[in-house]
């Protein structure tokens, strides 16, 4: 399964990239499951992101989504902090 991941704001600096394509050996059903797989495979910052995921927003193909919404082959995931304004 191929997915494109986009990071914004502090996540970009934390992980050292703003976008990256991943090829996974198995199907992933949700953004939450994707983070779980990444945390098991890479540890470190991925574990922290998985544990803190509710502090961040996720979009699937540029549509604001939930961590439990379905994802499919070739989808684009974007993870970013909540935006505030004034």
Residue ranges with predicted function:
Residues 1-85:
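Ubiquitin-like/PB1-type beta-grasp interaction modules and other compact soluble beta-rich domains
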């Amino acid at each position: 399964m191929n997915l494109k991941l986009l990071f914004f704001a502090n996540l970009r600096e934390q992980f050292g990239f703003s976008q990256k394509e991943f090829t996974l050996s198995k199907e992933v059903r949700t953004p939450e499951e994707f983070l779980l797989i990444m945390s098991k495979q890479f540890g470190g910052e991925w574990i922290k992101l998985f544990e803190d995921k509710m502090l961040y927003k996720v979009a699937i193909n540029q549509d604001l989504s939930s961590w439990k919404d379905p994802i499919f082959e070739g989808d684009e995931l974007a993870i970013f902090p909540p935006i505030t304004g004034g």
